Design a protein with these regions (language model features):
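A surface-exposed partner-binding patch
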Residues: 1-134
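Long, low-complexity, intrinsically disordered segments enriched in glycines and aromatic residues
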Residues: 78-197
Length: 198
């Protein structure tokens, strides 16, 4: 996996200590996030920030550094309150590999040939890497992608699981599409200092 991807994962709060470069599958499986991921577009809405401010006004008025520390801890906790964030969850999905736990899961929904119209890869073995509250709500890579350093990310939605697929770009572009905790805090601070809490 490209070093730039690993660097961005760490900037986003992920742990890459277990990444060895052995294989794409092993590297993706070794990545750990204990926090959600916020897409870059989140800063335009900052869903939940005003409500958090309303609930913590006394702290905001008396100790802004503590308020912002608590704000960051709240929004980057491993929780699933619907703020428009995404969640890194790395699990193997092998619906066409005989004797795998997923074998046959897509039977009657989509064929390997239909998937190959969008997905490039010798074997259709996938690592699901993320889900979100948006559309699509599941993201994955094909483990036999020709570019093992920076594979293509695909998207699908639970309502049309794998019968409708979209190319979302490279893995590097995918992770670059999220904001860091520092970027989140800067946007929230600007919003509160210049707007609602002024």
């Amino acid at each position: 996996m490209k070093q730039a991807i690993l660097t961005q994962i760490r900037r986003l709060g992920g742990n890459t200590d277990g990444v060895t470069g052995e294989s794409l599958q092993a590297d993706l499986a070794a990545i750990v996030f204990k926090n959600p991921l916020y897409p870059a577009g989140y800063v335009a809405e900052l869903i939940g920030v005003a409500e958090f401010w309303e609930q913590h006004q006394p702290l905001y008025q008396t100790d802004r550094p503590a308020f912002y520390q608590r704000l960051l801890a709240h929004f980057f906790a491993d929780q699933e309150l619907p703020y428009g964030q995404a969640f890194f969850r790395n699990f193997l999905f092998t619906p066409f590999k005989e004797d795998s736990p997923d074998y046959g899961e897509l039977a009657g929904l989509v064929t390997p040939d239909e998937i190959r119209q969008v997905v490039a890869g010798a074997d259709l073995d996938f690592m699901c890497i993320c889900y979100s509250y948006g559309f699509p709500d599941h993201y994955f890579v094909c483990l036999t992608d020709a570019d093992q350093e920076n594979p293509t990310v695909y998207g699908t939605d639970h309502e049309v699981f794998f019968s409708e697929l979209t190319k979302e770009g490279t893995l590097e572009a995918f992770f670059n599409g999220f904001i860091t905790p520092e970027e989140f805090l800067a946007a929230a601070t600007k919003h509160l200092e210049n707007g609602k809490a002024a």
